[in-house]
Amino acid sequence: MNLKKIYLIIYIISFSFLLGDDVSFRGKTSEQLMSQPIPLAFTNMVMNNYNILPSQINPQRGTFLIIAPDGIIQYLGDFVSFKNSQGFDVDVIALSEAGESASLIKSTIANKLAEDPMLEYVLLLGDVDGFASFPSFYYGPENDVSDQKYTHILGDDNIPDVFIGRLSIDSLSDLAVIMAKTMQYVKNPLLYDSDWLSRGLIVAGNYSNSYPIPITPKWTSYWLRDELLNYGYNQIDTVFYPPVQQGAPYIIPSINNGVGIVNYRGWGDANGWHYPEFHTDDVNDLNNGWLTPVFFSWVCNSNDFANNVDPCSSESV
């Protein structure tokens, strides 16, 4: 396995705004939540929306469900052991058992939640086509892809009942590299550089193809830079348009040097960021080894893993 560059995988997690006066966690009352364990990842949501004190609930590490194409399961042993070492109970279900349509897979997740109220995370393995095909849901006139519907199980609200992620792999090599990166990031992230997690990179572009030209991408990015420095980061690199149009010559060295977080806000699509430019082809010039940052890309289609541009920006990173 070539570890010259460890690819970042973006766990595409479904976020929902908790709106209204009747927000509930899986339809539970506060009395029910205080009388039984709850999955650890939902602790803050439960406390904030039920006005429950930390001493009144019993959050515990829950169940980590993996659903994978049948031919992938034999390669998951080390990753399953790793998740067990983090305190998770891990269940692995073959895609042939879960069902080969999105609606059937959602029913499998719902049945698992009914059997195991400590279900916390669901990990889907595979792209929507190709080597490890794994279906998803599509929305709107542009047929945008999203796994969020898998998380809407109980009630008619938009609140996720589980957290979900997808490893959009196109080969066994992709899978091996992603699993190695994930385990190394948790077990010994500072092995090769003791300071890299205290550095960050913020990229932004104030651009529009019509007036008025937005100003908030750079404004919010200046705010984020200050927030990170106040939080304890030692160095935040910035690459902004204007004045920089060709961003890759500045972005690549910053990432190769090691940064814990990369954030972009501006103008882009599945090909990557356009102002300043950093596209899927530029990813091949990254040589950051085990120093794999968390990427945030707040622009249309950069995470569209079903786009005709394949791999999309996030998949290539």
Positions of PLM-derived features:
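Generic cytosolic/nucleocytoplasmic N-terminal low-complexity/intrinsically disordered segments
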Residues: 1-4, 148
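Sec-dependent N-terminal signal peptides
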Residues: 3-16
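Cysteine-dependent hydrolase recognition
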Residues: 21-317
